[in-house]
Design a protein with these regions (language model features):
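Short, low-complexity disordered leader/linker segments with a strong preference
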Residues: 1-39, 70, 102, 384-386
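An alpha-beta-alpha
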Residues: 148-209, 231, 325
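Extracellular/periplasmic bilobed ligand-binding domains
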Residues: 189-284
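Extracellular/periplasmic periplasmic-binding protein-like sensory domains
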Residues: 245-319, 374, 378-385
């Protein structure tokens, strides 16, 4: 999902092919375990370089299942959430999934990052296991099989949404794109943005790229600025975004910046003395923390109380993914796999990241929050659909 993720996952896969170990197990019971519990599996990187994402997503799922158990569980039984650590490695993830099968799971909430999720989906296809990823944005995930769903939007979906926003809300006529050519996430957003922008009659005056390890973007920015775009799309993650926006402002760029959910957290890495570099920036995200929605605010409060930290979009999506699976099982009236998959396909769920139904590819149909950054603060610029 993330640029950083893509790099470490590639390294982890190489290591896994040469010396694959048994995944460390973390079994979490979301409430009092007893005979006759409904066992739902979870997969996430709980250790390793991408553990920050796995911990957040799995914490969100834990909170959801604990709330459900406190309210009586589902189908008259408590949920036993069995969570395994796959360390961000596709081979480890498949091994962990096999362990979950041995433990008798009836559904799976996971995985978190895209490469392990695709690997597990290929294996889960054989079992018709009801499976939902909270945060795997690679479009290929849900194309694997009819039993695979996702709670988040896709990379191309974000690009299309931001192109529509730029055309309809910002009324721009000329935009540029600067993206990471070595990252699927960045490339997926960039390509979809370009296609959608041009379809809206917006000129894409420059389409520039850079490598994963680059930290000097002045050559590309100079080329971009020579054509005077009104906005620049930066479909990358907040550490890189902070570098690019600073260099662009230093070169005299005064237009808008656009981005995807990888921007979430950029205010935490830009020094207050330079915070104005982010003025007139807009990025897509799964929710806006200051949205007055009652369910969202309840989640934010409960999560902070339980885990002593502020939730991020990974946590929110983990929560929604768990609740989606539980609702599908409840609607199915049993843990029969085919019945649960059928119920999920027809679900209508009111979540904290939006009201969710699924399209024919089992991707969520929901609105996306576009966040504006001005004066070092975030505000909701719009809620946008594709």
């Amino acid at each position: 999902m993330k640029k950083f993720m893509t790099t470490v996952l590639s390294l982890a896969l190489i290591a896994g092919l040469t010396a694959c170990s048994t995944p460390a197990a973390t079994t979490t019971t979301a409430g009092p375990a007893a005979a006759g519990t409904i066992k739902i599996g979870g997969l996430a990187p709980l250790t390793g370089d991408v553990s920050v994402y796995g911990i957040a997503a799995s914490n969100g799922a834990k909170l959801a299942f604990e709330e459900l158990n406190a309210a009586g569980g589902i189908l008259g039984q408590q949920i036993d959430f069995i969570l395994l650590d796959e360390k961000g490695d596709p081979t480890e993830a498949v091994n962990a999934y096999t362990q979950l099968l041995d433990k008798g799971i009836v559904a799976l909430v996971g995985d978190v990052t895209s490469k392990p999720t695709i690997a597990v989906a290929e294996r889960a296809k054989e079992d018709n296991m009801p499976m939902i990823t909270a945060t795997g944005t690679n479009q290929a995930i849900t194309r694997v099989s009819e039993n695979v769903f996702r709670a988040c939007f896709t990379d191309p979906g974000q690009g299309e949404i931001m192109a529509n926003f730029a055309a309809a809300n910002l009324k721009v006529k000329k935009v540029a794109v600067l993206y990471n050519t070595s990252d699927d996430y960045s490339q997926g957003i960039a390509e979809a943005f370009k296609t959608a922008a041009e379809a809206k009659g917006v000129e894409v005056s420059s389409y520039e790229g850079y490598g994963a390890d680059d930290d000097d973007f002045k050559t590309q920015l100079t080329t971009i600025m020579a054509k005077s775009p009104e906005a620049i799309l930066l479909p990358d993650y907040y550490n890189t975004v902070a570098l690019i926006t600073k260099q662009a402002r230093d070169l005299g760029y005064k237009g808008a910046f656009l981005g995807g959910d990888g921007w979430d957290g950029v205010l935490t890495v830009v020094d207050q003395s330079n915070i104005a570099i982010l003025d007139n920036s807009y990025y897509s995200n799964h929710y806006f923390k200051n949205d007055p929605d009652e369910n969202l605010q309840k989640f934010l409060k409960s999560y902070k109380e339980k885990f002593n930290m502020e939730p991020n979009s990974f946590a929110a999506l983990g929560y929604d993914a768990a609740k989606l699976m539980a609702q599908a099982i409840t609607t199915a009236g049993s843990t029969d796999k085919a019945a649960v998959v059928a119920a999920m396909k027809n679900i209508d769920y009111k979540g904290i990241t939006g009201n969710i139904k699924f399209d024919e590819f089992r991707d969520p149909v929901k609105t996306t929050s576009v966040i504006n950054i001005t004066g070092g603060a975030e505000s909701l610029a719009a809620k946008v659909s594709k």
